[in-house]
């Protein structure tokens, strides 16, 4: 089984000037599902570009679109699997913001846990068979990679889903999700 994960982030991870930071994304449980979504979204985007008088070279960013156009784009993806997390920055420990790399480590953690919860939901609903051979395809838009942690994002995701993780502070093991994770792209 091929699972495709597309994600993007919005906001600035800076607790002094910003209140929230958001990750959002889509998961497709087959290449056909992904192709269908891309076709539907491309069609909706064409209509929005005409209505909003946007040039082809410009990205259709939410900050410049009308609510009607944003709604049209969102509705084009209604039947697909969406996920997201909102980070309320003032609730986080101030040490997270002390270094650029600690900030990135926290963002990687938030992303990893969000994706993990979505996989767990799909397994519980029977949409994913965790015993099946699985290839994960991650497409993370403009993601910074340097952290001050043990793993970069790719390694952290692979550790979480293929091997399992151990929290040394609490002496607790969190088991792997996919026994037969054959590829991680």
State each model region's role.
Residues 1-185:
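Phosphate-ester processing/binding pockets and catalytic centers
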């Amino acid at each position: 089984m091929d699972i495709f994960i597309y994600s993007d982030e919005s906001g600035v991870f800076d607790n002094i000037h910003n209140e929230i930071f958001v990750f959002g994304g889509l998961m497709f449980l087959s290449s056909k599902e992904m192709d269908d979504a891309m076709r539907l979204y491309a069609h909706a985007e064409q209509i929005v570009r005409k209505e909003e008088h946007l040039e082809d070279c410009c990205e259709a960013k939410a900050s410049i679109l009308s609510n009607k156009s944003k709604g049209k784009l969102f509705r084009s993806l209604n039947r697909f699997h969406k996920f997201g997390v909102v980070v309320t920055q003032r609730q986080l420990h101030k040490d997270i913001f002390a270094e650029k790399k600690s900030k990135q480590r926290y963002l990687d953690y938030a992303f990893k846990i969000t994706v993990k919860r979505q996989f767990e939901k799909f397994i519980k609903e029977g949409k994913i068979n965790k015993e099946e051979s699985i290839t994960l395809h991650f497409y993370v838009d403009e993601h910074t990679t340097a952290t001050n942690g043990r793993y970069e994002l790719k390694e952290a995701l692979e550790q979480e889903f293929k091997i399992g993780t151990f929290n040394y502070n609490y002496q607790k093991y969190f088991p792997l999700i996919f026994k037969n994770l054959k590829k991680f792209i």
